Amino acid sequence: KTDSLRNIKERKGHIPMGETSGNNKKKHICIAMLAHVDAGKTTLSESLLYLCGKIRKMGRVDHGDAYLDTFDLERERGITIFSKQAVFPMGDLEVTLLDTPGHVDFSAEMERTLQVLDYAVLVISGADGVQGHTQTLWRLLERYQIPVFIFINKMDQEGTDKEALLADVRKRLSENCIDFTNGQE
């Protein structure tokens, strides 16, 4: 089940960001969702796949029907164990989305996807804030020189403080992090 990612460079010809593949004229990018456990990255992946028309119904990790969690143990435990991919069109792009495990026990599985990425989305739970594993992921992304979008999830939960969280992200990850919401929720 994990072979699909193992040879993604060769199979897809790993078309670098902004280049087109030979068999179609769409630009191809490869993006991965990375996060500490329970930050909501698989749910975010489901939402993206749904909004882009790849799936007709959003699954849920806690219901055992998430599109990218296909292994029986993943569905039983409600966790991602193996990195999975989905390919979908988005405007003039062809996007390969990789959903990766968030549990530290499966970090090697997550780390092997870093070699093929054009971009990463680092998901942080607004309720939990920056975790130790979040910082580890950030350092890995820096080491591999992968451009990162930080997505703060679960901001609707009680006790979240947007300004304090942004200050913590800037302190613990990078002072160059900026807020794209422009004050709009």
Where are these regions (language model features)?
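Short, Lys/Arg-enriched N-terminal segments with co-localized hydrophobic residues
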Residues: 1-16
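Non-catalytic, charged/low-complexity accessory segments that flank nucleotide-binding cores
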Residues: 13, 18, 22-26, 157-163
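P-loop NTPase switch module centered on the Walker A-proximal segment
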Residues: 18-124, 128-130, 173, 177-179
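Conserved glycine-bearing catalytic or ligand-binding loops at nucleotide- and phosphate-handling centers
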Residues: 48, 158-161, 178-185
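Residue-level "edge-of-site" marker
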Residues: 87, 154, 183
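Conserved C-terminal guanine-recognition region of P-loop GTPase G domains, centered on the G4
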Residues: 124-176
